Amino acid sequence: MSVTDPEALLLLPRLSIQNANAISSPLTWGFPSPGAFTGFVHALQRRVGISLDIELDGVGIVCHRFEAQISQPAGKRTKVFNLTRNPLNRDGSTAAIVEEGRAHLEVSLLLGVHGDGLDDHPAQEIARQVQEQAGAMRLAGGSILPWCNERFPAPNAELLMLGGSDEQRRKNQRRLTRRLLPGFALVSREALLQQHLETLRTTLPEATTLDALLDLCRINFEPPATSSEEEASPPDAAWQVRDKPGWLVPIPAGYNALSPLYLPGEVRNARDRETPLRFVENLFGLGEWLSPHRVAALSDLLWYHHAEPDKGLYRWSTPRFVEHAIA
């Protein structure tokens, strides 16, 4: 997958999102899907791209706070989503409860920027207009709240040009990285998933990619290694949790086509009769949360859409991080 190198990075700091969608796929819940953030940047590009003559492409996702709206009923081991109680119907009967997962979160977004407008407009003006438009939008189905911390001033967006000498770029990146801390960035670890699948097949030849994904994401208890003397006189039973190579999580990785691509208006009762339609199912992959200071370049954190309509694949990933992945 080839992507255009950004000419600048635009930081939207500390966005407080209320009631974001916490059900990211049929099999996962928690932090919103990366596709929600790439879609947000696409919608933001349509708002500001023409007036500023810039293109927003790619988004880095850094989470500072995540608060799932869940509770644990008394006497239960499982947790449930907090649901809303809707107003009564006209006849006074109780309205139906629509089950939905919601979460409050605080994120910083790092947008890749390129275009002629970078030379035509001051950096502060570009950052201000993009931040202003972003504050009026929804992200992952949630509302972006205005800054309400009276003790500290509202953080301003910042546009960082990636030109200049190597020393200047490193200095600017260190300064921008500090604004992302404390926080964790989400990246794709497709190479690690494939590597673990090959390791798993040495002992389990029929293992699938799903087996490798579950083995990496779940908590695995296993007995510790023992010496020959301990095997002769076995001690009491002992179990330990297998170490993981990082904070690994299953994530939605895109969509796979279930049907051919239908022409606009060909499918009855479609919401949009001017856009081609295709039925799809979720694809799953492996992600990792890591501190932004661990990457060689902040552009490695950017997520991109990648569509292959002929193959029926619509995916998102962090291709630069895959190339420079941390072992």
From Swiss-Prot:
The keyword Membrane does not apply. It comes from the Bacteria. InterPro entries: CRISPR-assoc_prot_Csy2. Disruption phenotype: Mutants lose phage DMS3 infection-dependent inhibition of biofilm formation while there is normal biofilm formation in the absence of phage infection. Loss of production of crRNA in the presence or absence of phage. Disruption of the entire Y.pestis-subtype CRISPR region disrupts crRNA production but does not alter phage resistance (possibly OLNs PA14_33350 to PA14_33310, and the flanking CRISPR loci), indicating this CRISPR is not involved in phage resistance. Keywords: Antiviral defense. GO terms for biological process: defense response to virus. It holds the Pfam family Cas_Csy2. Interacts directly with Csy1; part of the Csy ribonucleoprotein complex with a probable stoichiometry of Csy1(1),Csy2(1),Csy3(6),Cas6/Csy4(1)-crRNA(1). A Csy3(6),Cas6/Csy4(1)-crRNA(1) subcomplex is also formed. NCBIfam families: cas_Csy2. CRISPR (clustered regularly interspaced short palindromic repeat) is an adaptive immune system that provides protection against mobile genetic elements (viruses, transposable elements and conjugative plasmids). CRISPR clusters contain sequences complementary to antecedent mobile elements and target invading nucleic acids. CRISPR clusters are transcribed and processed into CRISPR RNA (crRNA). Cas3 and Cascade participate in CRISPR interference, the third stage of CRISPR immunity (Potential). Absolutely required for crRNA production or stability. Belongs to the CRISPR-associated Csy2 family. In this bacteria, Y.pestis-subtype CRISPRs do not confer resistance to phage DMS3 or MP22, but instead are required for DMS3 infection-dependent inhibition of biofilm formation and possibly motility. This is CRISPR-associated protein Csy2. The gene is csy2.
